[in-house]
């Protein structure tokens, strides 16, 4: 099969492949970029594989950087822009995977087949030369046509080599709307316990992409049916089933925070921040998700809660409430937000220093208490956010304390 037209990303990289070819070596576009071209999807990364060894690539191109030379990868700087920087990796075979994630060592080879047969799934094992000729050694085109995910060679071996491939399969089911071939799924289920060997950070990335996929329901269903959920920190299959059955069928998550919050609203006896600490996410992400889960429990928005959580989070929460079938006033959050004089305490027209100068106050608990009270009154519209009004109010507060 030959592509009728190369995508712009391949056209831009064409001279690199041609130059390698001129020196007597093979070079191909490989991996997900070729798959995405065949699916008519946007390309994110252009991966190039070659029969040339790393030192030979460095002899061909004047500007290179060793980014993973021990694994055969050299970054070729073909132009000034980052878009013209290409990672070029030598065809290779791999030894056993002691850690179930990375090979203990790699051997460079000249044979394309040897390189492609170590890849995870047939639809990721294509090669494409600089003229657009597709090389399909494992019947990936048939799988692509059938939207089917099949492991290259022995599925058990592929998942033994890299257990993260189990999560990748589920992610592809979600993002590409692929079904899993029977033997491949059976191997996923049989090897799901190996996910305990994989870092939670890597699993989180795959699970997060799964949740944001157009067919996230497929991915979550596979997570349950493969029993892989058992090997994810503090996961509950009942919560996953509730999300699948209780969330409206056409709902798609706006962002990662909303997706994880949706899951966690269905968990029982959950400490959100403690749960997310086990997933080693950032404090910022953890706080955002915890806020969404807390806000989900509110019956209605008022000035104080809207100010505390902010309109962005309020709208994300309202989307979840509606998707889970709760009857809410869809316009209330925006209406309440419009009634707020401030949306952050930095918008208060007077700062602590102003009060210190005006009333000879010193830094400390008393000043902090006054500032907090002023903020609360402005939020509740009990006090105008105006300098004279605030100074008058503070004066009253100080006189009452005498």
From Swiss-Prot:
InterPro entries for this protein: Bact_CCA-adding_enz_type3_sf (IPR050264), CCA-adding_enz_C (IPR032810), CCA-adding_enz_firmicutes (IPR023068), NT_sf (IPR043519), PolA_pol_head_dom (IPR002646), PolyA_RNA-bd (IPR032828)
Pfam families: PolyA_pol (PF01743), PolyA_pol_RNAbd (PF12627), tRNA_NucTran2_2 (PF13735)
Residues involved in ATP binding: 32, 35, 119, 162, 165, 168, 171
Cofactors demanded by this protein: Mg(2+)
UniProt keywords, alphabetically: ATP-binding, Magnesium, Metal-binding, Nucleotide-binding, Nucleotidyltransferase, RNA repair, RNA-binding, Transferase, tRNA processing
Enzyme Commission numbers on file: 2.7.7.72
Binding site for Mg(2+): 45, 47
Alphabetized GO MF terms: ATP binding; CCA tRNA nucleotidyltransferase activity; magnesium ion binding; tRNA binding
One record GO biological process: RNA repair
Function: Catalyzes the addition and repair of the essential 3'-terminal CCA sequence in tRNAs without using a nucleic acid template. Adds these three nucleotides in the order of C, C, and A to the tRNA nucleotide-73, using CTP and ATP as substrates and producing inorganic pyrophosphate. tRNA 3'-terminal CCA addition is required both for tRNA processing and repair. Also involved in tRNA surveillance by mediating tandem CCA addition to generate a CCACCA at the 3' terminus of unstable tRNAs. While stable tRNAs receive only 3'-terminal CCA, unstable tRNAs are marked with CCACCA and rapidly degraded.
Assembly mode: Homodimer.
Family in the record: Belongs to the tRNA nucleotidyltransferase/poly(A) polymerase family. Bacterial CCA-adding enzyme type 3 subfamily.
Miscellaneous comment in the UniProt entry for this protein: A single active site specifically recognizes both ATP and CTP and is responsible for their addition.
Protein name: CCA-adding enzyme
Organism field: Lactococcus lactis subsp. cremoris (strain MG1363)
Lineage summary: Bacteria, Bacillati, Bacillota, Bacilli, Lactobacillales
